[in-house]
Amino acid sequence: MKKLIALLLLTALVLGGCAASPAAPILNAAGVSVNLMANITAKPVADASDTGSLSKAATDFSVALLKNAAESGKTVVLSPYSVMQALGMTANGAKGETLQQLELALGMPIAELNKAFAAVQPDSAFRNANALWFRDDGSLEVSSDFLQACADYYGADAYAAPFDESTRTDINQWVSDHTDQRIPEMLKELRSNAALYLVNALCFDGKWVEPYSEDAIWDGVFYTADGSEQNARMMSSEEALYLKDDSATGFLKPYAGGRYSLAAILPNGSLDDYVQKLDGDALRALIDGASDDPVQAVLPQLELKSDCELADALRALGINDLFDDSADLSGIDGKQDLSVGRVLHSAVLRVDENGTEAAASTVEEIEMMGLRETNSVLLDHPFLLVIWDNQTQLPVFLAAVNSVR
């Protein structure tokens, strides 16, 4: 019987400041967690400078994941970057067909993906952290090569712990600390056959270049996918970058510093149909093709939270062996006795007059076994929201917005 890896991907997008991350090692309440990276130093990554290939791979993966995770008429918020970080670490322990399926879904060979992720430099607006917790009962002999790869390319910490209530507390505290306390309880329980947790946490805090003034905000109505009405605080502004293709219109709204933008995309038809027909190339072309045309933009304030299980969505992307007895994750412990059981994803997103603040956490639970016509975009019915990294051309967060709360 294989030891089961239940891959728990929880992503929370939260509007709120990102405080500085703690640097001290995590010790559980009994003080018995062991820092497995104590004798491992992250090595400089050669040629970690080109994120061009990662842009295409990440956008393709993001749209494909959204298609398979979204439910008709329901709001879903995802951090594909967080999911890819967790799967990237996993791929460093995968071999054979399991690795090939991961590489195909992620859009890059793992060696290239590792270097591309290492080239992405977080800043004051966007922070990313990774950590691994292994069961400290002698059931796993963790590969030093696996730990080295996670340290080199993902900056991961790693701990051996007793996997009792104190370990659950440690993991939850780590996630809370790295998401500015926006995800206080990542794990409700530790499964009795859990052998490893791979955890990613993201935090995004983007302030608008020009915050909305009080006279640009009013009480309005948002019409959900089923035609019902929600009271909404609507925010109006004139933006300079207009989005338009045969299927949608929208706008780009920049955050201070210039690196990130919010892309708000309003389909000509239903959001469900638009998402199902969308692909990565079309999304990149729409955003890259933004025109210097003024647009009167109306954006609702948002308070969103979604929770979903992503194992089926990842299977739909061709990642099958990872979840059954065919899994080969022998790069983690030298044995072919690990597989992935579940992938949980939780996300929270808030947009207001000051900007967008987001946090994300991914946990892999490894168990035993000029004068021109002004355009107008009124976002008073379902639309697609993207937080876009203009520097690396990466989608940091996506949301299919079918409601404002």
Give the residues covered by each predicted segment.
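Short amphipathic beta-strand starts and helix->beta connectors
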Residues: 70-75, 246-248, 280-283
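Extracytoplasmic/secreted cell-surface and envelope-processing proteins
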Residues: 96-102, 271-274, 306-308, 359-360, ...
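Detector for small/aliphatic-rich hydrophobic stretches
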Residues: 4-163
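Short Gly/aromatic-enriched secondary-structure transition segments
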Residues: 102-104, 212-219, 275-285
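Extended hydrophobic
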Residues: 198, 249-265, 371-405
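Non-catalytic, conformational "gating/processing" segments within enzyme and secreted inhibitor domains
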Residues: 27-33, 73, 114-268, 288-370
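Composition- and surface-driven signal marking solvent-exposed, interaction-prone regions
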Residues: 211-213, 265, 274-280, 363-364, ...
